[in-house]
A protein has these predicted regions:
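Membrane-helix interfacial "entry" motifs
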Residues: 6, 60-71, 96, 100, ...
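Membrane-embedded catalytic cores of phosphoryl/pyrophosphoryl-handling enzymes
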Residues: 7-16, 30-33, 134-225
């Protein structure tokens, strides 16, 4: 009973944190459409928080090294997600029934779909453009998709590692790698100069909101330790 009560408290704390990050994302998005709008982007494209964004972009500049590194890490994160999709498909085939499939795996796939849909929505619902031209054209920039996807995938991967890997040294090592990746991509995208500061911040907020929702759900599953 004490263990179950503890898990419920942890789930409540996680969903509360998720709500905070989602609220921060919503506030940031609304402010980007209204606060300190300035034509500081390429081809005089307008950006919210223009003073802060331009200051940080001018100070950090651009880095081809960080761009290539974060691109590679982004592909690795997607490969990790695909690995979970394949593992879930194998388990589904082995169990021969979706009802016998571990709930945390089923819900993880649902969350992957949600994140993919969110990505597509923001590709169409333009908030602002990148601080650079891509192939000579303006491109949607908010939130940073690399940041959103990597933060979400790595945090949910940590949840899976904690639940499924029983070798403590291996679990610790893999979790540490996931944390490093989740941190280095947002920082790297900013240093690469391919996103405004608020793009990266929005990606972090939304990635954490969605991944913490998933973590909270897992805490509510009786057999998910």
């Amino acid at each position: 009973m004490n263990s179950e009560s503890s898990k419920q408290k942890q789930a409540f704390a996680l969903i509360s944190l998720a709500g905070i990050f989602l609220a921060l994302f919503a506030c940031l998005t609304a402010l980007l459409l209204n606060y300190d709008l300035g034509a500081v982007g390429p081809e005089n494209s307008v950006v919210g928080f223009s003073t802060v964004n331009k200051f940080i972009f001018d100070k950090l500049g651009q880095s081809d090294f960080w761009y290539k590194l974060t691109e590679l890490i982004g592909y690795f994160a997607i490969a990790v997600a695909l690995g979970f999709v394949v593992y879930t498909a194998i388990e589904l085939f082995r169990q021969k029934s979706i009802k016998k499939l571990d709930i945390d795996l089923s819900v993880l796939i649902i969350f992957y779909i949600i994140v993919a849909l969110v990505y597509l929505v923001f590709e169409k619902a333009l908030i602002n453009y990148r601080p650079i031209l891509v192939d000579g054209k303006l491109e949607a920039s908010y939130p940073s998709s690399h940041t959103l996807l990597t933060v979400f995938i790595m945090v949910t991967t940590i949840v899976q590692l904690l639940n499924r890997v029983h070798n403590r040294p291996l679990k610790t090592a893999l979790t540490a790698i996931a944390v490093v990746i989740a941190v280095i991509v947002p920082v790297g995208r900013l240093l690469a100069g391919v996103h405004w500061f608020t793009d990266v911040l929005g990606g972090v907020f939304l990635g954490l909101a969605l991944s913490l929702c998933y973590a909270a759900f897992c805490k509510c599953i009786p057999d998910c330790e």
